[in-house]
Amino acid sequence: MASNQELACVYAALILQDDEVAITGEKIATLLKAANVEFEPYWPGLFAKALEGVDVKNLITSVSSGAGSGPAPAAAAAAPAAGGAAPAAETKKKEEPKEESDDDMGFGLFD
């Protein structure tokens, strides 16, 4: 779990990025001092080195929520358009699952 010092450095870096200011150890330390955050002196430099050459704004906007695969359905939708109506009919046949009865599985509630 991240410590309060780490989180404070992350927030300071995000503030600097939002203001479109270069992220340096000195600027992170200045923000932390202005916010009266107690921190070890190595944290600002560590975060500045980690974010050196990284486009933080692009990094934030490209983070996925992990909810699903966005590009895969778009690619699958493009394939039937190029192939015609025949592949679309085949996918409908594959999507129909075979229904199974719970009776023959032996999972009765009151058995």
UniProtKB/Swiss-Prot annotation:
InterPro entries: P1/P2_N_sf (IPR038716), Ribosomal_P1/P2 (IPR027534), Ribosomal_P1/P2_euk (IPR001859). It comes from the Eukaryota. Pfam families: Ribosomal_60s. GO terms for molecular function: protein kinase activator activity; ribonucleoprotein complex binding; structural constituent of ribosome. The keyword Ribosomal protein applies. Residues 65-111 are annotated as: Disordered. One of its GO terms (biological process) is translational elongation. The keyword Ribonucleoprotein applies. Residues 65-89 have a biased composition (Low complexity). One of its GO terms (cellular component) is cytosolic large ribosomal subunit. Keywords: Ribonucleoprotein, Ribosomal protein. P1 and P2 exist as dimers at the large ribosomal subunit. Plays an important role in the elongation step of protein synthesis. Belongs to the eukaryotic ribosomal protein P1/P2 family. This is Large ribosomal subunit protein P1. It comes from Caenorhabditis elegans. The lineage of its organism: Eukaryota, Metazoa, Ecdysozoa, Nematoda, Chromadorea. The gene is rplp-1.
